[in-house]
Amino acid sequence: MKQLPLSKLQSLFAAVSAAQKLYIPADDAAGQASFTVWQEGIALTKKLNTVRSAKDLFFPQVENLVGFRVTGRQLDLVETRDPAEPFVLFGVRACDARSFEILDRVFLSEPQDTYYAARRAHGTVVTLACTRPEETCFCPAFGIDPAAPQGDISCWIEDETLFWQANTEKGEALTAKLPMLEDTDDAAVAAQQEKTRALLKKLPLAGLDLSAVGAGKTKALFDRPEWKQLSESCLGCGTCTFVCPTCQCYDIKEFDSGRLVRRFRCWDSCMYSDFTKMSAGQPRPTQLERFRQRFMHKLVYFPDNNDGCFGCVGCGRCLAKCPIHMNIVKVIKTLGEEHA
């Protein structure tokens, strides 16, 4: 365990960014927190979490794949992908850190997504423990401990001190470049963890029951009449999918500038009526079917195919951002009523 006075945090950021790009959660002009390239004077946000997740750094909303240049009858491939460079992602919360493991199951399984894999290989994740969990948080339901976040490096802030623990070879390599960190014990961290875990037990969503969902529940849940009632209030705006740290759906499009055809991918949403649109039509033409697909995927289909691992991390972003307050917790509770 290492430590650093919080007053020297900017010096730490400067040392890290001297060798590679550093992203930290910082407030923008509108007061919204997002992961931003650190520059001198940019301060770490005091908000619990960013509006959009840290997923953006590994799976960007828009990403170049390849280009084509046509000269007469000749077609040439042009490398247009953004080059992967080493970077450090500081201040990732435990929920977002778990989301990387979920995305890994999708993009790093064979055949590997080389674009995602390159970013994962070049990124060093520094997590930051939560001390003030909010009412929308329910990550413990999925076995996540926000007081002990996992990452290449885990950090805690307590008594105006940053505590720093390297967990992987990447973490050790970065730590070795930061001589301002001093050895210490973990007594202060252990005390903070105890306080945070006590707070978690008092949250409104503490003890959220997941017994009605999970692997093997397709037959029991697919034709439940509650889907109609739940889906009727949904606007189909897709906000939940764009703030979600685990959604991984995308579309592939092409843009012709006249000199170069650029093929790129961009996030898509299963809540949209033209999602996976094909010449024969869309596979889920109604709002009910699309709504059911979104939540069945996170709560049943993904666990079915991934050793029981849910496709949700309990970050609470969909609870905070849905304009009509329809969210995954309401779905879980509604489906669990008959089960209980």
Task: Give the ranges of each region predicted by the language model.
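General structural feature for long, well-ordered alpha-helical segments within catalytic domains
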Residues: 8-12, 240, 266, 327
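Active-site-flanking alpha-helical
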Residues: 100, 245-249, 323
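Basic (Lys/Arg-enriched) interaction patch that binds polyanionic ligands
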Residues: 231-251
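Iron-sulfur-associated redox domains of electron-transfer enzymes in respiratory
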Residues: 1-217
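Ferredoxin-type iron-sulfur electron-transfer modules in oxidoreductases and energy-metabolism complexes
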Residues: 210-232, 250-340
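Short alpha-helical basic/polar micro-motif
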Residues: 93, 238, 242, 320
